[in-house]
Amino acid sequence: MSDNKREQRKNEHVEIAMAQGDATISDFDEIRFVHHSIPSVDVDDIDLTSQLKDFTLDQPLYINAMTGGSEWTKQINEKLAVIARETGIAMAVGSTHAALRNSKMASSFSIVRDTNPNGIIFSNVGADVPVDKAVESVKLLDAQALQVHVNAPQELVMPEGNRTFSTWMENLAQIVSRVDVPVIVKEVGFGMSKETIKSLNEIGVRYVDVSGRGGTNFVDIENERRTYKDMDYLGLWGQTTVESLLESASYQQDMDILASGGVRTPLDAVKCLALGASAVGMSRPFLNQVENYGITETLNYTEQFTDHMKKIMTMLDVKTIKDLKQTQMVFSPKLQSWIEQRGLDIR
């Protein structure tokens, strides 16, 4: 594929993603917290710090992998980097493959580090990238961690996508052993099963982003790019973020589980943390905010989001993310059925 074609595809992804709406029905609504009437904590007591295995996040929120690889997406990445810098949240870039193939595209990613020299930044490659290119991707951004995205459904619906996946697990193992920063294996909106998480744990992966169904839908995005748009029936493929977090329960002591996919509100984010996530990522909400309303309004949105998380934690009478993981929740019959049929040990 030519560089112009790749740049066009990057722009198409952003345009279609921005046009997608939030899910009207979400598994986050299948969870209820138990309200206790008299909190013993004040809002100012709430500590949103999240301690991961290799670094500390001042806020349990991050701008998740989105874009890069074109002039337009360079501008988007620069604006998002300002948001990350000013609010102190972490940020991931989209797949750096374009920059690894063509050095002219490198600035569309490195602009993030240039804009936010002291922030926590995740670089991003695919599961099929050669190990030396994974190392190069980390250097490109002086990244604190490397996301490796696994996106088989997207590739299979993408007209020009990959059709070979049997080497992915072995390649992931090699990347983990060679890269000198933490490796985050990240889904792209299809969720993860306990079997996948177990396999990743066995090859030394200590971070996964379960990235469940409910947010940006890459089956729908790639189907829009197909001549006959003939694979729309796969639009609900995969596990939701809630189902994926439940699937991860047995591995939350050994691994840091990150949650993303369809997080709409601060309440959704708090539910992710209560289900065992160490941090919560969002992509499209930040993209839509910064492109439609600008940097100042996006800063206000981000600060309001974390402030509301503190208020919810106050109502739950918990001071820390660690305390939140012990809070009481009630699951709907739908989620309880998933837990029972999948044989999940969630407490």
Swiss-Prot record:
Binding residue positions for substrate: R9, K10, S95, T96, H97, Q154
Catalytic activity, as annotated: isopentenyl diphosphate = dimethylallyl diphosphate
UniProt cross-references to Pfam families, sorted A to Z: FMN_dh
Enzyme class: isomerase
Cofactor: FMN; NADPH; Mg(2+)
Cysteines paired by S-S bonds: none
GO molecular function, one term: oxidoreductase activity
Name of the molecule in the record: Isopentenyl-diphosphate delta-isomerase
InterPro entries noted in UniProt: Aldolase_TIM, FMN-dep_DH, IPdP_isomerase
Binding-site positions, Mg(2+): E155
